[in-house]
Amino acid sequence: MKKKVIFGNWKMNGTNESLTDFLNQVDNKIDSSKIIAGLAVPYVMLQTGLKLAKNVKIAAQNVHYKDKGAYTGEISTTMLKEVGVEYVIIGHSERREMFNETDLDVNKKAKVLLENNITPIICCGETLQTKESGKTIEFVNNQINIMFEGIKKEDAIKAIIAYEPIWAIGTGKTATSSDAEEVCKQIRNNLSKIYDKNTAEQIIIQYGGSVKPSNIQEYLKMPNIDGALVGGASLLASDYLGLVNYNE
């Protein structure tokens, strides 16, 4: 049985001081034999987090697909690997909306991360307009097709997919657990076509979108939802513990 994989995403929040306080409150209250708990923090906090955390996987929130060069403000896989980062979020809807990132960009990032033995958390999800037009599955599967293009199955099983409907991120709106399960099920079916059933079963699929301690359990009991990617509800230590220890 796969361990559930629950990651918080602090986005552009926090300080080294607040992260230190946060980890002092949560790290020794997580049983890493039962769950994979993680936290994506701003770049300037990565080393603090990596130094202090024993049971929380510290992740970066983005990476560039080039290894070096004239890309002001960007960060490379080599730089993240040097400080010990093992997980990186790529393709978050905020990156897509604000910085015009595409599925092809995400595909390039996924490849370079996997080549360097870093786990990409690959985000996908539809807008409200796409949902209302009844094209969610078609849209999300097209994203998956592009983002996994050219990735071998032995690498694909190391990736994590985070299904985050854009209309549910930070809005307080949530997909019902059955709706989220249906999309995650179709993502897995699509992965079976790209690779094979065994490969598809091994790939972790998270749900994200206004997940909080009060509703996480109903999502994680679904057969095709292997974890959660959580934004605002991961900022407070008490809420974070309510998420990662949801089953206690």
From Swiss-Prot:
<keyword id="KW-0324">Glycolysis</keyword>
<comment type="pathway">
    <text>Carbohydrate degradation; glycolysis; D-glyceraldehyde 3-phosphate from glycerone phosphate: step 1/1.</text>
</comment>
<dbReference type="GO" id="GO:0006094">
    <property type="term" value="P:gluconeogenesis"/>
</dbReference>
<keyword id="KW-0963">Cytoplasm</keyword>
<comment type="pathway">
    <text>Carbohydrate biosynthesis; gluconeogenesis.</text>
</comment>
<keyword id="KW-0413">Isomerase</keyword>
<dbReference type="GO" id="GO:0019563">
    <property type="term" value="P:glycerol catabolic process"/>
</dbReference>
<feature type="active site" description="Electrophile">
    <location>
        <position position="92"/>
    </location>
</feature>
<dbReference type="InterPro" id="IPR013785">
    <property type="entry name" value="Aldolase_TIM"/>
</dbReference>
<feature type="binding site">
    <location>
        <begin position="9"/>
        <end position="11"/>
    </location>
    <ligand>
        <name>substrate</name>
    </ligand>
</feature>
<feature type="binding site">
    <location>
        <position position="210"/>
    </location>
    <ligand>
        <name>substrate</name>
    </ligand>
</feature>
<keyword id="KW-0312">Gluconeogenesis</keyword>
<dbReference type="Pfam" id="PF00121">
    <property type="entry name" value="TIM"/>
</dbReference>
<dbReference type="GO" id="GO:0046166">
    <property type="term" value="P:glyceraldehyde-3-phosphate biosynthetic process"/>
</dbReference>
<dbReference type="InterPro" id="IPR020861">
    <property type="entry name" value="Triosephosphate_isomerase_AS"/>
</dbReference>
<comment type="function">
    <text>Involved in the gluconeogenesis. Catalyzes stereospecifically the conversion of dihydroxyacetone phosphate (DHAP) to D-glyceraldehyde-3-phosphate (G3P).</text>
</comment>
<dbReference type="InterPro" id="IPR035990">
    <property type="entry name" value="TIM_sf"/>
</dbReference>
<comment type="subunit">
    <text>Homodimer.</text>
</comment>
<dbReference type="InterPro" id="IPR000652">
    <property type="entry name" value="Triosephosphate_isomerase"/>
</dbReference>
<feature type="binding site">
    <location>
        <begin position="231"/>
        <end position="232"/>
    </location>
    <ligand>
        <name>substrate</name>
    </ligand>
</feature>
<comment type="similarity">
    <text>Belongs to the triosephosphate isomerase family.</text>
</comment>
<feature type="active site" description="Proton acceptor">
    <location>
        <position position="164"/>
    </location>
</feature>
<protein>
    <recommendedName>
        <fullName>Triosephosphate isomerase</fullName>
        <ecNumber>5.3.1.1</ecNumber>
    </recommendedName>
</protein>
<dbReference type="InterPro" id="IPR022896">
    <property type="entry name" value="TrioseP_Isoase_bac/euk"/>
</dbReference>
<feature type="binding site">
    <location>
        <position position="170"/>
    </location>
    <ligand>
        <name>substrate</name>
    </ligand>
</feature>
<dbReference type="GO" id="GO:0006096">
    <property type="term" value="P:glycolytic process"/>
</dbReference>
<dbReference type="GO" id="GO:0004807">
    <property type="term" value="F:triose-phosphate isomerase activity"/>
</dbReference>
<dbReference type="GO" id="GO:0005829">
    <property type="term" value="C:cytosol"/>
</dbReference>
